[in-house]
Amino acid sequence: MKVHIHTKFCLICLLTFIFHHCNHCHEDHDHGPEELHRHHRGMTESESSKFSVQDAENEKKYYIEKLFDRYGENGRLSFFGLEKLLTNLGLGEIKVVEINHEDLGHDHVSHLDILAVQEGKHFHSHTHQHFHNHLNAENHTTTSVTSKRNHKCDPEKEAAELPIKADDKHLHDRNHRFHHRHRLHHHLDHNTTRHVHNDSVAHSEHGEPGHSPSPETNKTQEQSEVKSVKVRRKEKGKRKKENSEVNTPGFLPNHDHSEQYEHNRVHKLDRVHSPGHPHAHLPEHSGHELGHGHQELDPDNEGELRHTRKREAPHVRKSAIYSTPSHKDQSEDDRQHECLNVTQLLKHFGLGPNSPISPDLFTYLCPALLYQIDSRLCIEHFDKLLVEDLNKDKTLVPEDKTNIGASAWICGIISITVISLLSLLGVILVPIINQGCFKFLLTFLVALAVGTMSGDALLHLLPHSQGGHDHSHQHTHGHGHSHGHESKEFLEEYDAVLKGLVALGGIYLLFIIEHCIRMFKHYKQQRGKQKWFMKQSTEESTIGRKLSDHKLNSTPDADWLQLKPLAGTDDSVVSEDRLNETELTDLEAQQESPPKNYLGVEEEKIMDHSHSDGLHTIHEHEVHVTSHNHHDEDKAVLRKHSHQWHHRHAHHSHGPCHSGSDLKETGIANIAWMVIMGDGIHNFSDGLAIGAAFSAGLTGGISTSIAVFCHELPHELGDFAVLLKAGMTVKQAIVYNLLSAMMAYIGMLIGTAVGQYANNITLWIFAITAGMFLYVALVDMLPEMLHGDGDHEEHGFCPVGQFILQNLGLLFGFAIMLVIALYEDKIVFDIQF
């Protein structure tokens, strides 16, 4: 019995000696770094454990400063800086992956790599070779680390490999966790730079006690903590060991989440597709639940993992603390599958777009960013989007299809009704507005109609007919790209709209040129007439008297007998009229040909009757030439102007624009048919466009209705002005306008039916409607702007003022349609019936 007890005692001593010898080797290996750490820090082991929180704060400040130096300004992160950061992380907007990447994996980094290839930021020449090269480099590093770990008890080898041990362990851990993943070149370069910085920190800590600790210091602290954990595990068991890990100041339970944060800071390396770790692909795990990923590893690797994650521990603690009250909100966002942009992210934290973000506030945003990265809400696959759209169309319940169709019909009818009610506005405005003001207003509104209709055709309908826009879903456009990339995306997205804008510019340029030429000719003619009138008014009296004296002296007495006035021409008023007209005709004849001595009787018979009447008045003028005074000459000048105004007015009335008397002579029935046919065709095209747009989507229907609404107001006012000018009553004008509005309902019904049951024809309807709009704008209304009404000039209407109003109307119409074309996709209406 005593022998057995002695034997057991010897075995216990032997085991104790062996264990003590191994621990002595381990302590000898750690003695140099510990003494170096105590020499530089002047602290005991307990003091360094207490100081780890301060080191963590320094590490947090260091990385936040790096981020703020890159994306911020003056120690603050602006809205655009945060937006750029989210874009580099792959957040802020939904990005569609269009390239097949089965060989690269489906992790977040692979998605970002594919998006970089799509955007031209990165290229892959040989994907598989590139992938294996990374694996070979990592496996080589792993081999060296493994061999180094197998010779832990050799102090010389470990002392030689000490400067690069932290770096090798980083790479070993990443190789162990990410050996099934493709990674980018610049990611490895960035991590290498970070490790070099860590080495420099270790050498520069002599004069900077407040900076981050060196990797050697972290290693010493961690190994002492690992040793204490092993002793407690032998003494108290596995349960005590887990409790001691929770109380260790390295913040170990959440180390996997901290690794995720450090990688997400660069390229969102959050999770892995690894056959050996199937639990790593669980999207429902939150930040603190990701820490169980390496509990199956052996104790030796556990110590290295703890050392590797020592630098990221402060971020985990901050994230865990700050994310605790908002965990419920994050789970709700996960159920909603919402990709938050910068504005939404700041709004959830009670901040505005103009609020600068301090480093302390940024620590509150980090958990939300990690959650967005982990849930991958901002990455979609192109093939999945297509499948979802097809499945959505196929899986629609017949009741849902009926509701969608009913909403298109109801919205179309409401839109046409609202637009048709503009006729009542015309009824109210036309009688109230003064005639002079109405002419100014109508000139502006006609130009506005031309601008809106031509702009709607070239900027909205034709781009839609070419498939440039799609109203069936909302487009999201990010703003976090560089200016060059933004301009490139803008040019590609709105290529058809910009080409239509160039076409409008050509129309406007020719309009300006033609209008300027007409104004120049008008002022030139006006100046010539004024000079001629002034010259004739000064020389009229003297030339007339000389000519009359010459005729009296050269005409024989026999001829005077044949030039007696007719009976009834003694009236003074008639004689004055005849006198002035004859005097003007004689003056014109004398300027063209040399004066004749006399006119014989036979020649007088051959002359026109108007000239014979003039000869009678000439005789009367010669008999009473001495009795006329200057007052009579003034009357002659006034009569002359009246005669020439009448002649010019008659000439203008034969132009394309008719006066009120001409419209009355045409007949109310003809005017009514003209309005019904012209305005009806226009309204039919409006209804066709509105119906087709509402059948394609509610947003497109609203934007098209706004476009029609803008150019329908001047059109309706012009129609009422024409009808009332033709002599119609207000009731008749309302009836005829309602008849023309019925064509809009017919067009809307046809457009909606075709859009609902024949989707391929919708684009052709847009093209036909664009042609109708161009015809009405450029053929019917633009000539009226160019030629105008002759009455305007005679009532003091200035051509320069008319030109300015027309330019304002055209440019305003173009601007309205351009704004609608650029921002129609951002108009969202969720109306369900």
Swiss-Prot record:
The modification Phosphoserine is found at S593. The gene is Slc39a10. Residues 30-48, 152-167, 200-209, 281-315, 326-335 have a biased composition (Basic and acidic residues). Keywords: Cell membrane, Glycoprotein, Ion transport, Membrane, Phosphoprotein, Signal, Transmembrane, Transmembrane helix, Transport, Zinc, Zinc transport. InterPro entries: ZIP (IPR003689), ZIP_Transporter (IPR050799). It is found in: Cell membrane; Apical cell membrane. It comes from Mus musculus (Mouse). Belongs to the ZIP transporter (TC 2.A.5) family. Undergoes N-terminal ectodomain shedding. This is Zinc transporter ZIP10. Expressed in the liver, kidney and brain. Residues 137-147 have a biased composition (Polar residues). It catalyses: Zn(2+)(in) = Zn(2+)(out). Its main location: membrane. Residues 229-241 have a biased composition (Basic residues).
